[in-house]
A protein has these predicted regions:
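N-terminal Lys/Arg-rich, disordered targeting/topogenic segments
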Residues: 1-15
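Substrate-binding cleft of extracellular glycoside hydrolase catalytic domains
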Residues: 39, 44-61, 77-160, 166-171
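Functionally critical loop-and-helix segments that line ligand-binding/catalytic clefts
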Residues: 2, 46-59, 190-191, 195-261
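Glycine-rich, charge-decorated loop segments at or immediately adjacent to ligand/cofactor-binding or catalytic sites
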Residues: 115, 181-188
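Aromatic-lined carbohydrate-recognition surfaces of secreted/lumenal glycan-active proteins
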Residues: 170-183
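Hydrophobic membrane-insertion alpha-helices, especially the h-region
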Residues: 17-35
Length: 261
């Protein structure tokens, strides 16, 4: 038989100390968070080639207020899953290109949906243009689907979409992903596919140390002309490395202002 112990409660005079301790712990926590965020900003500033990505969540963007010289690349959300189309994609696509931005499109991949259907949704939505950046497949952790399907099943469907986009656009697709998803699903696979890593609290280092191409280092960016906070990204390498990357995509010899299409 267990004995119910008497629970002691702090005296009234000790409450100020508890409050003080809580305040100190909160300040320490905030300080650590601030340190990591500032460290990320400092690290990202080492890379000269900057860009951003947007979707309908950013609302009406004043593209004429943003400089293509400051932001060398822009990615726009186009589709999600098998049938969702971003309502701002066409407008953003036309206006960003009109202002001379180098533009690409991305698809938010749904792990529980068929890869072929998702590829078709993207292909029906995103124009095939020789002056566009490679297509991006956004792969993110989904506990329900990851626990429903085996790693092999997930990789098979991702491969289907990857291959269909490669065949249609003639450019090697890029995988946008997090450390968690990469380390669980993608590690040691798709070794020729460029990686775009989301990492806000440290360096974009992955299991096996694969080279990354883009790094989304914050979701709290501010850009004049965009009414909300926005994701900011950098390209790994110098400006000459960026030119070499564009040359491999057949994109370097572009006019200053791209035609409206």
């Amino acid at each position: 038989m267990s004995v119910r112990k008497k629970v002691s409660t702090p005296s009234k005079t000790s409450y100020p100390y508890y409050i003080l301790a809580c305040v100190v712990m909160l300040c320490v926590g905030l300080g650590i968070t601030y340190f990591f965020l500032q460290n990320n900003v400092a690290s990202a500033q080492e890379y000269p080639v900057k860009g951003f990505d947007v979707s309908h969540h950013q609302g009406d963007i004043q593209w004429q207020s943003i400089s293509p010289q400051e932001f060398k690349f822009v990615y726009l959300k186009a589709t999600e899953g098998g049938d969702f189309k971003d309502r701002k994609f066409q407008d953003n696509w036309l206006k960003a290109r009109e202002q001379g931005f180098l533009v690409g499109a991305y698809h938010f991949y749904r792990l529980c949906r068929d890869g072929q259907i998702q590829a078709q949704n993207f292909i029906e939505t995103v124009p095939k243009k020789t002056d566009s950046l490679p297509p991006v497949i956004d792969l993110e952790y989904d506990s329900t689907c990851i626990n429903t399907y085996t790693r092999e099943q997930l990789l098979k469907e991702i491969q289907v979409m990857h291959d269909q986009l490669y065949q249609h656009y003639g450019l090697q697709p890029i995988f946008y992903t997090s450390k968690a998803f990469y380390n669980i699903v993608l590690v040691d696979e798709f070794k020729q596919t460029p990686l775009w890593i989301r990492e806000y609290q440290g360096q974009p280092e992955l299991k096996g140390n694969p080279k990354w191409t883009f790094w989304q280092h914050t979701s709290q960016g501010q850009i004049k002309g965009i009414p909300t906070l926005v994701d900011l990204n950098v390209f790994q390498g110098s400006e000459q490395d960026w030119i070499s990357f564009l040359e491999r995509q057949g994109l370097y010899q572009l006019p200053q202002n791209l035609p409206i299409k």
